[in-house]
């Protein structure tokens, strides 16, 4: 969450994951981070697939995240993400559906959409991001359905009591 008083973009992320005596570190710049500008009070999400790991499967992990943020001018269009619904489909594909609405008076040809998943206690359990191939004029709304292939949380619809989204529209 941007608890400051100016727009920011996350310019670097360092994750340290530890469990069962093993630990791994991943450092990266989030995709399209120059366009993902959080206004004061906004909450954003970062998702990263780490691939092969030395952390034993099924172990409880400890995650330490260090973020570097830089002041940015607000850019692009805000995209409201609402009417979110998760479905676990046969045989094992989870889908996320909802509606995207572009900010009045702004247009965009590209976008990044983020969703955060929370359990019944309001505890954050994971995030997903995607880009929807859609041109928006100011005020346009478009429905979407995306397959969440390889999402690591099985039966997400049973575990996520709340889904929150945020979207960013921009032109290259």
Positions of PLM-derived features:
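Intrinsically disordered, low-complexity Pro/Gly/Ser/Thr-rich segments with frequent PxxP/GP/PP motifs
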Residues: 25-55, 125-153
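Asparagine-centered strand-capping/turn motif at beta-strand->loop junctions
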Residues: 1-7, 100-105
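Hydrophobic core residues within well-ordered beta-strands of beta-rich domains
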Residues: 44, 94-96, 111, 142
